[in-house]
Amino acid sequence: MSVSYWMIEGVGLNAADIESHINKEKAARFFPEQFPEEADLKDMVLTGDFSSFDMEEYYYGNGFENLADVLCYCDDTDSLTFGDDGDGTAYFYYPPSMPWHHTSNEPQTEQEVIDRIIKAVQKITDMTEEEIKKIINNDLYVVGCG
C-alpha cells in the first residue's frame, strides 16, 4: 500500500468556515450558469422559491467535488484553486508561484488575492468583507495525505 502526500499552501480559507453563511438565493442564481440543463434550478429562479435548494446535491461528483470547488467557479479570474487534505477538509486558496510561471491574470499583490477570495465568497454568501477577511489565512500551510 502506498501513501501520497501533497501541499496546500498559499493564501486562502477553509471552505467549511463559510457553509453556514451560504445564501440559498444567491447560490441558486449562480448554479444555472454552471448547469444550464437543470430545469429545477431555472424554475427556482423564475418562481423566486429557493426553499428546496440544496447545494450539496451538486457535490461529490455531481458537478463539483465540494464547496471549495464551487468557489473556484465563483472566481472569474481563474487564478484560485482548491485542495482537500485527505480527511475531508477542503480549502479554497491561491498557491504561490514563481514569477516566470505567472500568467496574465495572476494577482500582483497579496491584497489582490484577498480581494479575489472575497469577491468569490460573496457570490454565494451573505458574508461581509470584514467577516471574510477574518477567516482568510495569509499563511495557509496544510499537508494532505491519502
Residue ranges and their predicted role:
Residues 138-141:
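Glycine-rich, aromatic-bearing surface loops/beta-hairpins
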Residues 1-126, 130, 134, 146:
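Acidic (Asp/Glu-rich) sequence patches and key acidic residues
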